[in-house]
Swiss-Prot record:
Gene: ALPP
Lineage: Eukaryota, Metazoa, Chordata, Craniata, Vertebrata
Family, per entry: Belongs to the alkaline phosphatase family.
Lipid-substituted positions (GPI-anchor amidated aspartate): 506
Cofactor annotation comment: Binds 1 Mg(2+) ion. Binds 2 Zn(2+) ions.
Protein name: Alkaline phosphatase, placental type
Positions annotated as active site in the UniProt record: 114 (phosphoserine intermediate)
Subunit composition and interactions: Homodimer.
Organism encoding this protein: Homo sapiens (Human)
Length: 535
């Protein structure tokens, strides 16, 4: 006869089994469901035709630290927020028809940082760890290795071709990833001149904020990073009583004012209301919006009355940039995905990924894939894992069904290293469902570190639009920059010989040579002249 404890255990197991079976749609038990779904996907794939024209516009969406495990977990979370089981609901990026893998290593490191990876996917050249916009001949923190080793970004090439260009990020605009569009520095942490050693300043090395306004003419700059633009002691408009949030510059410069003075029609804003007004004003030709002293707030902490979302910043940028008949280049970064992972707080990383995906979806609604090449990728991954055989439909932040060898619960999401390593009385603490579901919860880590690290595996590249079919297979991260340059007939691919996108004239898109088209007319004219002058 079974005892009361065994009966209770069987009851709980039966309830768990009933719940797990009850949430699975009945139609999924029928093979026809899966055969029909696969046949529909196959039919769509057979109809897929490469867009062989040139791209008028280029958009690269960069999910900082958004490895494949992050994409999968975010897909489930986004689906569950819509009251679905999770994995069956595609993300906006999932709908891009072409996918490849990108090798993210730096020249000197198996596991990369965001500075050297930015050099790879934006400039088409690999560099050394923690350097930006420089070839591998430059050495980290050695100012005298800068000059002569600069490499040029696709954004810079787009500007030279007459396109408008913009940078949108949830980090500070001087951070490693956005800086890859415009800066050349041997140290990614030289945000303002206060961060640059005196010896490097004497050698002529400029801080990243100075390069932001002087290296090239950027039409739209949106993100955080106010304090690096103003002289030390300048109060911040949002936090006037907090000295630590004020200006940091030692040279006494007001870089925002310098930027405004050089550009007719330029506008500077620091809050959401001003951004919305400026983006709708046809007299505004250049827009700089800096919404926090440093990085922007996580989406879960964002004050929607003061701080715009990534989607709103992307929409504002597209409004301004799309006015140029020659097209545009736009860099959009979900930068705080990375920061959430570094903190071992998966809730923050995944909600940032969802916001990033929302921006991708909105941009797709505001542009056409006939003339806009859109790429989505990550600079690197994280030591972020997703396992433990959780039941489908269970919370992505929940507990695995079984216990660990120490007879304690463990979460579905874990980190290989980081600040989540905790011992309580010499042992791993137990964790409850309510704890693991908190936005502030740190997932447990195997190795104790103050900050969780990047990972070295390949990351995904999603592509849609003209020349997107070139994104295939397993490629070096540098390939991304070259695909963008070729698709838009930018240097070094100005002789791309691609037809202009629909609705675009050759004058607005000079990449295709007009000489071949004129040859028959020229030959006919010469023949008529020869006939007329014949005796």
């Amino acid at each position: 006869m079974l005892g009361p404890c065994m009966l209770l255990l069987l009851l709980l197991l039966g309830l768990r089994l009933q719940l797990s079976l009850g949430i699975i749609p009945v139609e999924e038990e029928n093979p026809d469901f899966w055969n029909r779904e696969a046949a529909e996907a196959l039919g769509a794939a057979k109809k897929l035709q490469p867009a062989q024209t040139a791209a008028k516009n280029l958009i690269i969406f960069l999910g900082d630290g958004m490895g494949v495990s992050t994409v999968t977990a975010a897909r489930i979370l986004k689906g569950q927020k819509k009251d679905k089981l999770g994995p069956e609901i595609p993300l906006a990026m999932d709908r891009f028809p072409y996918v490849a893998l990108s090798k993210t290593y730096n020249v000197d490191k198996h596991v990369p940082d965001s500075g050297a990876t930015a050099t790879a996917y934006l400039c088409g050249v690999k560099g050394n760890f923690q350097t930006i916009g420089l070839s591998a001949a430059a050495r980290f923190n050695q100012c005298n290795t800068t000059r002569g080793n600069e490499v040029i970004s696709v954004m810079n090439r787009a500007k030279k071709a007459g396109k408008s260009v913009g940078v949108v990020t949830t980090t500070r605009v001087q951070h490693a990833s956005p800086a890859g569009t415009y800066a050349h520095t041997v140290n990614r942490n030289w945000y303002s001149d206060a961060d640059v050693p005196a010896s490097a300043r004497q050698e002529g090395c400029q801080d990243i904020a100075t390069q932001l306004i002087s290296n090239m003419d950027i039409d739209v700059i949106l993100g955080g990073g106010r304090k690096y633009m103003f002289r030390m002691g300048t109060p911040d408009p949002e936090y006037p009583d907090d000295y630590s949030q004020g200006g940091t510059r030692l040279d006494g410069k007001n870089l925002v004012q310098e930027w405004l003075a050089k550009r007719q029609g330029a506008r500077y804003v620091w809050n959401r209301t001003e951004l919305m007004q400026a983006s709708l004003d046809p007299s505004v030709t250049h827009l700089m919006g800096l919404f926090e002293p440093g990085d922007m707030k996580y989406e879960i902490h964002r004050d929607s009355t003061l701080d715009p979302s990534l989607m709103e910043m992307t929409e504002a940028a597209l409004r301004l940039l799309s006015r140029n008949p020659r097209g545009f280049f736009l860099f959009v970064e979900g930068g705080r995905i990375d920061h959430g992972h570094h903190e071992s707080r998966a809730y923050r990383a995944l909600t940032e990924t969802i916001m990033f995906d929302d921006a991708i979806e909105r941009a797709g609604q505001l542009t056409s894939e006939e003339d806009t090449l859109s790429l989505v990728t990550a600079d690197h991954s994280h030591v972020f894992s997703f396992g433990g055989y959780p039941l489908r439909g269970s919370s992505i932040f929940g507990l695995a069904p079984g216990k660990a060898r120490d007879r304690k619960a463990y979460t579905v999401l874990l980190y290989g290293n980081g600040p989540g390593y905790v011992l309580k009385d010499g042992a791993r603490p137990d964790v409850t469902e309510s704890e693991s579901g908190s936005p502030e919860y740190r997932q447990q880590s195997a190795v104790p570190l103050d900050e969780e690290t990047h990972a070295g595996e390949d990351v995904a590249v999603f592509a849609r639009g003209p020349q997107a079919h070139l994104v295939h297979g397993v490629q070096e991260q540098t390939f991304i920059a070259h695909v963008m340059a070729f698709a838009a007939c930018l240097e070094p691919y100005t002789a791309c010989d691609l037809a202009p996108p629909a609705g675009t004239t050759d004058a607005a898109h000079p990449g295709r040579s007009v000489v071949p088209a004129l040859l028959p007319l020229l030959a006919g004219t010469l023949l008529l002249l020869e006939t007329a002058t014949a005796p």
